[in-house]
Amino acid sequence: MSNEVSYSITINRDACIKCGLCERFCPTEVYIMDDGPQPVHPEWCWGCETCSGNCPKNAITVEINPDALAAEDDYPRAKLIDEETIETYKEWAKTLRDVLQLRWHPVGVRLIRKGEPFPEGVQIPKERMRYCQSMMAARRGVSLVMPANRHSCPDGTSILGLTDVPPKLASGEIYILFHKLDTQEAASRMVNERPMLEPYSMEATCVFPLDDPKATVDVVSVMGNPEQMMWLSMATSYYTGHRHDFHASGYNSHCVEVTLLPMRDKKINISFGCYGGRASSDVSDDMMMMGIPVELMPDVVRGVRELSKRVIPQERDKIYLPPMRSN
């Protein structure tokens, strides 16, 4: 039995207007135009549904092949965390949730390096998912480990070092098609300025609620409202007074801004989300994200505890807001 996930593509020829958008938008060049779109390379399909999502007539259906649902999980497994670290992570999660009143679990993120085993007790999803979708699942309490053949976003997967970059993404062409950027020059600059890990340097992504840790983490991701992000920012600088230089763009939110930048730079970073992350998940429009490198977590948690002694309750009680008076 194969570990691969494959998809079948069905086109409603009666509805199709042969506009060619599916061929232009497909990041992995599944289609050619020959009297309408022809999915000549269905084996290249990632199940991202960019083609069906941009079809003006909803004429395209992308479905996972039944054999993929029965695929065996034969990846090597090992325990990737010790008991002391488990208790530390649980305490971190409890402090953040209790003090900041987070609705969602803080998420532990571990990138599985090439040659490393997968963590014990973590499921591989049967279908492909976007990395940002896996983060949304983890904030709700689900643990997932995803090798490249379970990722459905070629952009995030290549950024995180699981694959190489498809040509349409490497050139920035697809961002022009989406009307996200004005010119090819702007698209090329955006692509060239974002960081990327070495292709094929990573085996998988692993995400889980921090209070149910499955591995040591590279980054902790927190989703919350702007006020909660403010306290995390203040907690990080509680002992230093340092002001933060955040890098946010509206592009590649979870993969670059929440994961890769904090992991690489050893600094916290905020993200407002991105088109793909918001369009493919249930993240609400009042939420934003922060990535915290694990190296900073002890000071962040200590800072949160200190802030909870006075300024957090004072701010939430609105102590400087004049009382409403009626004449």
Residue map of PLM features:
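Short, ordered beta-strand-loop transition motifs
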Residues: 2-3, 33-35, 212-214
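Residue-level detector of conserved, well-ordered beta-strand and adjacent loop positions
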Residues: 12, 32, 40
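Residues immediately within or flanking Cys/His clusters that coordinate Zn2+
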Residues: 13-23, 42-52
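A broadly conserved detector of short glycine/acidic/proline-rich loop/turn motifs that flank catalytic sites
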Residues: 15, 66, 226
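Iron-sulfur cluster-binding cysteine motifs and their immediate structural context
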Residues: 21-36, 50-66
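Short cysteine/histidine-rich metal-coordination sites, predominantly Zn2+-binding motifs
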Residues: 35, 40-44, 64-75, 92-98
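Acidic, serine/proline-rich low-complexity intrinsically disordered regions
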Residues: 76-327
